């Protein structure tokens, strides 16, 4: 594929500045666009994403998109787009997409969807979100779904026009691959924001099952469920085998200290952490939800179990750790699959192709 013209200018908008999947994706995409000769500008709320953009030399503008900022954000985004002379505006997530739609920048809008479900039990909230998504899908020239699971949600639940949906998997900068011929121990790692949807409680409960009694668990990440997870570890009698490590800055080092990665999410539209672990050569066992099955291609590059099933998670993992041949095969397969399907370079090329579709550049 040919590259975009070197003078193409892109405004990337996201309403989240945390160190989670969406902001990580936007930062990686901005780096890929810059490397290809485009000029990206990230617009996001104050927070860690702003700081990381500045550290990496990515142009960034900080603006509030909640509270009082909700009302003023469309005007500020329109001004920002015009000052940047954006040839395309690209929103990520419903809040950013809605604000950018209301901004009426005059530039074609691409919107990336990062959810494959409603994530609320309230019928009223579902109805509101469905309406907002339908309006957004009509307003944006093209939609990007980060997995087939997200694309199916858009067409089946939201009613999006499948002809205007492009599936582009999130991409990562692969970690250095260290092939493993056998596990050094029985250390399992979970790297996630500590929220209910990530299923970290399932990982803790897995240690209390018969198959999990020989396992130790390293938990990297922060979030609102920390206290409840610590209490759970004591309640089920596994606190001596659970290490809460807090925010992890060096993911390569984290994975090097594990023999297996778990991604026990209850819902996962994509699953960047699975890609990161696989790229390092660390075998992965994950929930059979959302984009995780697409990433792992079980049983070739990873293993999956039914979600919210601690016994199955522990049993499958113990079996893998006791099978050096299969363990080594998964360790070897992971980096190659990430290189072919989930690299940041591939994501950047395909995303620039979408920009060409809507701009003609």
Q: What is each stretch, according to the model?
A:
Residues 20-31, 186, 190-209, 224-230, ...:
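A conserved mid-protein helix/loop that constitutes part of the nucleotide-sugar donor-binding site
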Residues 149, 171:
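Carbohydrate-associated surface elements
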